[in-house]
Structure formats: C-alpha cells, structure tokens
Design a protein with these regions (language model features):
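Conserved SAM/SAH-binding loop
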Residues: 348-349
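Pre-Walker A adenine-sensing motif
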Residues: 324
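Class I SAM-binding transferase module
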Residues: 1-314, 320, 328-341, 345, ...
C-alpha cells in the first residue's frame, strides 16, 4: 500500500486566553500545530482613551514584542482583534470606544506580525464603520472570520419559539457587506468557520468563489468514534477536502488548551487531506491571468507551441476525425488507386501533420499533404521534420498566409486548429472563410462547426488582479481607455462561483456556404441568479465538432476529459454588480468586424445598466 502524499498542511491552535506565550507556542507545536491564534488583549480589559491618568496607563494594554523574535511573531502567531466591541453602535460612546480599541490593536498587530495574519470576527452585516476602521492602510492580511451558517438560523430550525426572520440573515451577506465597504481590498480575506449545520450545496459553491484563506474548526463539531478518536462527519470531511483542493487554505482549530485530544484534531485533519489528495494537473495556473493569443497577427514562439503539443487528448481526437473522414471518402475498393488531398492550414511545428499521417496509416488510405504555415520560425522546424522524419511521405510545405495560398489542386480535407477559448476569438471564421476556396465541392473541414458559450460569474480574485493592473495606469489614460477592465482574458478559473448555467452565443459552420459571408454577430442572453451574489463578469467557453460525432469541448457540462489546451475566457465588468436571488441578468454581446480587426463588445441591461465595454475594440482588438 502506497504512502499518502506529504502535502503541506498548516494548522493554528486558537486560544482565548494564555499566560506564557512561548510556552503556549511550544505546547501547540508538541500537539502538531504550526502556530497559535491569540487575542492581543484580555477580552474583559476595557481601555480608557480619554480620561487621564488611565489613558496613559492603558497604553500598555498588552504584552511586549520582546517576548518573541520577529520571525516567531510572523510565523508562529496570528493576532486576533477584540470581538466584544461595536464600531457600528448607534450609541456614540460605544462606537468611539470600539473605534479606538480596534485602531490601537490593529496598529500594534501590524507592528508585531508585519505583513502576516490578523483575525477579526464578523458578527453581523451591519459593519460599514467596522470595515472603514480596520481596512484603511492595511499592510498585512486581515482574516475576516465568518460562520458558514448563521447560528440564529440553526436555532430557528430546532426551536418553535425562535424568530426565523431574525435568523434568516445569510452570513455570506455579512461578508459581502464588509468587503464591499472595503472596496474589494485584496488584503481582506475570509476565515470561514465550519458550523455543525452545513448549508445547501449551491451556498457552499458560492463560498468557493470567495477569497477563503483559512478554515476555522471548533472542537465541538468533532465526533468521537468507537476507538475514542476525534473524527468529523462524512459531510464535514468532504467539505474539508473541497476547500483545501480549491484554496490550499490553512486551518484554525478552536479548542481548550487543556483538551486531551488536541493532537488528535491536528493529526486527523492532516490524515483526511492526505488520504483524499488528488494532484490537479493544471496546478500552478489557478486563476492566473493570460492575454489571449493572436496567432494570425503574431508568430508564436517555441515554448507556446510546446505547451499546446503536450495536450494528451486534442491531437488524438484530430487523428480520429481525419481517419474517419478518410474512410468515408475513400471506399475500400479504391484505397490503392485514390489519393486524398489533405491541407493543414497553420502547421505550427507539425502535430496536425503527424495526426494526418497516423490517420492515413491506420485507415490504410493514400494521402498527399499540403502544409501551410506563415511563421518563418515554424517553417524551420517543419522543413527539418519533412527532410529527416517524413522524407518518404508525400508532403509539400508552403510558407505563406493560408488566405493567400493558391494551391495547384483542391483539397478533400481541410484541417486547422485555429480555435480559441471562446471558439472564434483567434479568428478561425475569417481564416477558414479565406481558405475554404481550396476545398473540393464535397470537401470537409475539420473542425466543421464551433459554438461559443457564456455565463455570469463571481470571481473576486481575477477581478482584483485586473483592477490592480488598471490602477497602475495614469489617471488620464484610465479614464480614456479602461484598457484592462475592458479587455478579455484567459484563465483557469478555480476560485469562482458560476451564477447560472452557460448559454450558447455564436455559432460558425465550415465551410460557410452563405452567398454573402458576414461574421459579425449580436446576441442577447438572459440568466437568473439563484442566490445573492456579486457579478464580476462573464466566463466564455466553446465546443467544436471536428467530424460527425467527434467533438472537443471546454463547456463545463461537456468538457472533454483530459483536454488541457484551453482555459476559460473571462469578460470583466468595470464595476462589480450586486445581484439578488431571483433577479434576471441580461447581457448584450456583439462580435464586430472591420477590414483590419475583429473585437467583442458587451454590456448588461439588468439588474442594472452598464456602459458598453470595449467599444470599437479600444481596449483589446483582435488584429487580422
């Protein structure tokens, strides 16, 4: 039996009170905890900020920083701010006392842990002043502790005399209010407390779209098994694994320091995570922004070619499609006398040529292959392959743009891989429309159809990255162009919540037999939110029919297993939109075409109106 993988799991022991700081750290370490989470001041210590001499005396409200080294403060301690204050009280004295207390503690916490973790417990959605006080000039990471289920909701489920309306306040709304007041500050993250009650699956998925940095586990949600060990219910185990896979988060365990099962809690969490660990093949690309390629305008480099060629699935499917087409076009009685003409438009470094040769070999059909490639650097590679590996094959290499190629004969099969994350965003319609004149009247194109899809999503991590790029622009340029907030991006969206299911947007068929070809498009889509959420933009996908029933897809419901060449497209909104459960989301989407470029435009008309993004391709045109 193989050993479980040694993944890194960081666990902090939460303590309400302690006397000897270094002893507490050593005690936690012996119980397999990496750090401790402690209050900066005793919860019953009410400080005086106005009256002397108490005001001066209360400046010494907590322990000295000399008790630990700066490295220990940073790596072994999470500072917790007082939770017994009310910065949003209607009573001015209470409010001002809360403000002064938290400002004092926050200043000292940042003095201790520099850019480390500071924990703040959120008790309600009435938190505008709390957010203002605690997030201005924040240098470290503020972990906002939020319970997954409102305790009053759980209470209402069991007590007939409980006021359900009071308990119906969703804790996600608490968090959403706080981070909205903080203007989506990237220093503010969630410490999500797992409660005994677990919410509906869709509410869990909504939390997966938030910046969860820590999971808080109280000792009272652990059960005791037959061997007297602390364990979690099956549902909590699955939740634990799900959040770790999505975020790689760390954990905070709330327990009495004298609890004899302290070591069991830590060991059990690590055991569950290691036992259920599955390495994500796309690890490292999580929520990483990439600018979409423009292979028609730019020449790809060797590294980019190599990444695409490593896709374990795509070229097998292309090979199967070409093989099927060859079998259909050349009956068994003609395999010795008939040669099929295959044109590979956009040969790259030869993966499609290799797929065509393999298809010919497996189907036992004779082929002549024209390879058309405009990139002079890729021509060097293709020439070497033809002269060294394929010298006995009937292959002709043409160094030109596929739209300008004038072949001596027409093709039976036209093969290309010009698909982008949104299907047509690498200008496959324009390229194939120009190349389809080389097809025989009964010739086939592989692929023969592509469809793009769109759905609204909540993706604060991606949105924050884009906004940080936008803020780096000079104010004048930012007003004129909104260059980054109106551009499109490719990303492996892991930390995101999909508000509704994707719907089809544009469809392109090849060869295009329309008497007048027009590749501009316009579509209005209507979606509906199931939960309160924040919309940051739209995710784009595509699927494509290569030949007959052989397809490739990055649509979430039909994603081709193992396909790694494409991530989702992301179309941002310049401002986040608060959406309520049951509200309709209406988006207008355009594909615009000019003589020298193509671009997308989009806007929403519900639940509120937005301006039209990327007008005239001002932020991101796709050059022909």
């Amino acid at each position: 039996m193989s050993e479980p993988p040694q993944i890194k799991v960081s666990i902090s022991l939460h303590q309400d009170t302690l006397y000897e700081l270094e002893t507490a750290i050593e005690h936690a370490a012996k119980s397999n905890y990496n750090s401790i989470t402690i209050p900066l001041a005793h919860r019953r210590f009410e400080r005086e900020f106005v009256q002397e001499p108490l005001k001066t005396g209360h400046n010494r409200f907590t322990r000295s920083d000399l008790l630990l080294s700066s490295t220990q403060w940073l790596n072994r301690v999470i500072c917790r701010l007082s939770c017994g204050v009310d910065c949003d009280s209607e009573d001015d004295n209470v409010r001002k006392q809360g403000e002064s207390t938290l400002r004092q503690e926050l200043s000292y916490a940042e003095h201790l842990v520099q850019n480390g973790y500071i924990l703040l417990r959120l008790k309600s959605g009435n938190c505008a002043n709390l957010a203002r006080v605690t997030t201005v000039g924040l240098k470290g990471v503020l972990l906002v502790e939020v319970p997954m289920v409102n305790p009053k909701v759980a209470q209402a489920n069991w007590r007939s005399d409980a006021d359900y309306e009071c308990g119906a306040d969703d804790t996600w709304n608490w968090w959403n209010n706080f981070r909205s007041y903080a203007d989506f500050d990237t220093h503010v993250k969630v410490a999500l407390e797992f409660t005994a009650d677990i919410p509906e699956k869709r509410e869990i998925y909504r939390w997966l779209g938030e910046p969860v940095d820590a999971v808080v586990l109280s000792s009272n949600i652990f059960l005791t098994n037959a061997n007297n060990y602390a364990v979690l219910s099956k549902a909590h185990q699955e939740l634990l694994v799900l959040f770790y896979r999505t975020f790689g988060c760390h954990f905070i365990v709330k327990a009495n320091p004298d609890d004899k099962r302290l070591v069991h809690y830590a060991d059990y969490i690590k055991y569950i995570l290691r036992s259920n660990y599955k390495k994500d093949p796309m690890q490292g690309y999580d929520d990483l922004l990439e600018i979409p390629l423009q292979p028609l305008y730019d020449n790809l480099d060797s590294f980019t070619y190599e990444v695409f060629e490593k896709d374990p699935v795509k070229y097998i499917l292309y090979q199967n499609a070409i093989e099927e087409a060859l079998r259909d076009r050349v009956p068994s009685s003609e395999i010795q006398t008939r040669t099929s003409i295959i044109m590979v438009v956009g040969g790259g470094r030869g993966p499609l040529v290799r797929a065509a040769l393999n298809a010919a070999s497996k189907s036992k059909r004779m082929v002549k292959i024209y390879v058309v490639e405009k990139n002079p650097n890729a021509i060097v590679t293709l020439s070497a392959l033809i002269n060294e590996l394929w010298k006995d094959k009937n292959i002709e290499l043409i160094s030109t743009d596929m739209r300008e190629f004038e072949p001596p004969e027409k093709a039976d099969i036209l093969v290309s891989e010009l698909l982008g994350s949104f299907g047509d965003n690498e200008l496959s319609p324009e390229c194939l429309d120009g190349a389809q004149k080389h097809l025989k009247p009964d010739g086939v194109s592989i692929p023969c159809k592509s469809t793009s899809y769109l759905n609204p999503c909540m993706a604060p991590k991606i949105y924050s990255q884009i906004r940080s790029m936008e803020k780096s622009l000079h104010a004048k340029d930012r007003i004129v162009t909104s260059r980054y907030m109106e551009g499109t991006y490719v990303a492996y969206l892991k930390n995101a919540y999909h508000i509704d299911n994707p719907q089809a947007v544009f469809e392109f068929v090849h060869p295009n037999l329309d008497p007048i070809i027009d590749n501009s498009r316009y579509k209005t889509l209507r979606f509906k939110a199931q939960l309160d959420c924040v919309m940051h933009g739209f995710c784009g996908y595509f699927d494509s029919v290569l030949y007959k029933d052989i397809t490739i897809s990055i649509h979430p419901f039909t994603h081709t297993k193992g396909l790694a060449s494409w991530f989702s497209m992301f179309f941002p909104l310049t401002e986040p939109v608060q959406v309520r459960a049951g509200e309709e989301i209406v988006v207008n989407f355009w594909r615009c075409v000019a003589s020298h470029k193509v671009w997308y435009e989009w806007n929403i008309t519900a639940p509120r109106q937005s301006h039209i993004h990327n007008v005239q391709g001002r932020a991101q045109p796709i050059w022909k």
